[in-house]
Curated annotation (Swiss-Prot):
Residues 1-27 form the signal peptide. Glycans are attached at residues 401, 645. Pfam families: P_proprotein (PF01483), Peptidase_S8 (PF00082), Proho_convert (PF12177), S8_pro-domain (PF16470). Its main location: cytoplasm. It is found in: Cytoplasmic vesicle, Secretory vesicle. This is Neuroendocrine convertase 1. It comes from Mus cookii. Keywords: Calcium, Cleavage on pair of basic residues, Cytoplasmic vesicle, Disulfide bond, Glycoprotein, Hydrolase, Protease, Serine protease, Signal, Zymogen. InterPro entries: Galactose-bd-like_sf (IPR008979), Kexin/furin (IPR034182), P_dom (IPR002884), Peptidase_S8/S53_dom (IPR000209), Peptidase_S8/S53_dom_sf (IPR036852), Peptidase_S8_Asp-AS (IPR023827), Peptidase_S8_His-AS (IPR022398), Peptidase_S8_Ser-AS (IPR023828).
Amino acid sequence: MEQRGWTLQCTAFAFFCVWCALSSVKAKRQFVNEWAAEIPGGQEAASAIAEELGYDLLGQIGSLENHYLFKHKSHPRRSRRSALHITKRLSDDDRVTWAEQQYEKERSKRSVQKDSALDLFNDPMWNQQWYLQDTRMTAALPKLDLHVIPVWEKGITGKGVVITVLDDGLEWNHTDIYANYDPEASYDFNDNDHDPFPRYDLTNENKHGTRCAGEIAMQANNHKCGVGVAYNSKVGGIRMLDGIVTDAIEASSIGFNPGHVDIYSASWGPNDDGKTVEGPGRLAQKAFEYGVKQGRQGKGSIFVWASGNGGRQGDNCDCDGYTDSIYTISISSASQQGLSPWYAEKCSSTLATSYSSGDYTDQRITSADLHNDCTETHTGTSASAPLAAGIFALALEANPNLTWRDMQHLVVWTSEYDPLASNPGWKKNGAGLMVNSRFGFGLLNAKALVDLADPRTWRNVPEKKECVVKDNNFEPRALKANGEVIVEIPTRACEGQENAIKSLEHVQFEATIEYSRRGDLHVTLTSAVGTSTVLLAERERDTSPNGFKNWDFMSVHTWGENPVGTWTLKITDMSGRMQNEGRIVNWKLILHGTSSQPEHMKQPRVYTSYNTVQNDRRGVEKMVNVVEKRPTQKSLNGNLLVPKNSSSSNVEGRRDEQVQGTPSKAMLRLLQSAFSKNALSKQSPKKSPSAKLSIPYESFYEALEKLNKPSKLEGSEDSLYSDYVDVFYNTKPYKHRDDRLLQALMDILNEEN
C-alpha cells in the first residue's frame, strides 16, 4: 500500500512537471486588455457592441475599414492567460465577423547585436559615406558605391516623395533632419499621440529610428553630419517599438496615412535567434494588402524591409513572414569588401542588396544620431533597408506613376551581381537572371534603376494574376531522419483561364508540416525549367516540435520564368537524429505573375561590368562608348593591351611589342605595395635579372578571367561553393576583388621568377 502511494505521488509529480513545461511555453505570451474585431456594420455598430458588452471603443485600426479596437472595462491591463470567455462572447455576437484578444509581440531592431572624397558637399561626414561615392581615383578599380551621384546630377533628389520609418521614434528636431520632417507621416503608437519623439535613456536605446531616417533624408550642405540618399525627400517617424507591440499596433503602423506616405521603411522583425517562426498577424496582413491596393491613390504603398541579422545564429529569413511577404522588398547587406557580412541571413525571398557594415575593421554607415549628434557606426541590415528606401524615393520622383510591382520589377531588372560576384551561390535562372540566396538579384544600382523608370519609356507591368496549384487527393506523407519526401507538381499555370500565368514573379509554397524537430528540415523547390531554390535550410537552434502550420515559403528566384511544366518539391532531414519523425500534411503552390510578358522583359537582361557607368570625379561616361573602347584597353603603365579574345593575327602582330605593351614587374610590385602595406614583408620577390621582363598579356587576362570563377573546395557540394555553405567566408584569404587581382598578378610574377 505504501509502495502504491509512492508510485501515485511520483506519477502526479511527473504530470505536474509536464504541465508546467507546457504552461511555460504559453506563459511567454503576455495578453493585453485589447480586443480587435471586424464589424461590417461600421462605427455605429461597434459603438453599440462596446456599450452592450462592457467595452471602451478605442477606434478604428489604422486604415482598415470595419476593424476596431476595444478595451474591456473590468479586465486587467496585462495577463498571462487569454480571456477566452470574453473573446467568445464578443465573437459570438452576430454583428461581429471575428474577434481576437491582442498580445505582446517580441520585435527586434535589426542593428548588429554586440558580441580624399568628392568635394560635393560641405557636410563634415560626407567624406566617410563610401557607399554613396567612391573616393578612389583609379578608374580601373571596381566600384564600391550605389551609383546615386549620377541621379543627383540630373536634379533628382527625392523631391515630393514621403517616406516614413517604422521604428522606436524619430528625433525630428535634429539639425540634419528637421527641414525634411513631415508630421503628417508621423505618429506615436506607443503613447497614442502625434509626436514620435524618442524616449531618452542612459543607453540611447532608442537611437535606431533616428539613424534609419537620417540615412534617407539628412540635409545636404548644412555643415551637419552627412547627406541622405534622397536629401530633398520628406521623412516621418512611427514610434511603435518602444513599448508593447501587438498586431493592432503593427497594422496601424504599416497602414498609417497610406494616401500620403509613399514608402514605409522597416528595420525590425521577429527575433533573429535561429529558432523563431513568425509573421504578420491577421491585422498586419490586412494592412499590407490594403496598402498595395489602396495606398498612393491605388498605385500601392512601397514596403521596404531589412532581411534580418541572424546569420551568426544560423537563422533563415524564410522563417520571417515580414521579409517573406510578396508585398515587401526584402533588402540584405554587403560589406565594403563586396562580401556577405557575418550577420546576414540567407533566404529565397531577398530581392536585392545595399551596403552596410562588415568585419569590425570595415567602415560602417554614417547618419544622424540622438541628441543632435552624428554617427559613423550604424550597422546591420537595419542600415541597408533605409538606403534602399532612399533609392526608391529617387525613382518615385523621376516617375510618380510607378506601381508597387513596377518597383519590384525595376529592382530585379537593374540590380547588379558583378560587384558581389566573388561570393558563392550565384545561379542563372530560366529567364537569364542572376540570383543568390544571400543577395537576391544583386547590389542596387540607383542610376540604372532611375534610368529604366524614365516615364518616357517605362511601361507599367501587366495586371497581377494568381494561380493556385494543389492536389486534392494528396494523402499525408511520412518523413523520418535521413529520409526524404519528393512531390512532383505538374501544372499548366491556369492556362486558358483569366488568371493564366506566363511570366512569373513570386512563388509561394504553402504547407503544413508536422515534425518533431523543426530545425532539421530542408526544403527545396525546383521549377519547371530546372531552377532549384532552397526554401528552407536547417537551423541548428530550432528544436521546436511545432513544425509549420499553413506557412508560406516564398521565393523570387524563378522571376521571369514560364511556370508551365512539372515542378519538384523535396523535403529532407539529413540530421542523423534517428528519433526525428513527422509528416507532410498538406501543401499548395501559389504562382504570382502576369498573363503576358512585361515590356522591359521582352529582350534578355544584359549584364555588364558595374564599372561601366562612372559616377564620381572620373565623370559620367555613356555605356555604349565604354563597350566600344574595350578592345583597346590601356594597361597599367599606359600602353595598349590586346584582349585575350582578339584574333590570332592581331596577337601575332604584337609579339614583338610585349616588353613595351605589358605591365613591368616593377610597376606591378609598386601597385601591390600601394594596396597592401605588408605585401613586401610577407612575400619578398626574388630579384629580377631584367627590369624589362614583363607578363605576357595572355596571362594578365587569365588572371582577370579567374576572378569570377569560384574556387573548388573539398567537401563542398559538387566540389563548388554551395549556396548554403559559409566555409567560403572563413577560408578566403583575400576579401576584396582588388586584392585578389593583385595577388593573381603577383602569383604570375613569382612563376616568371
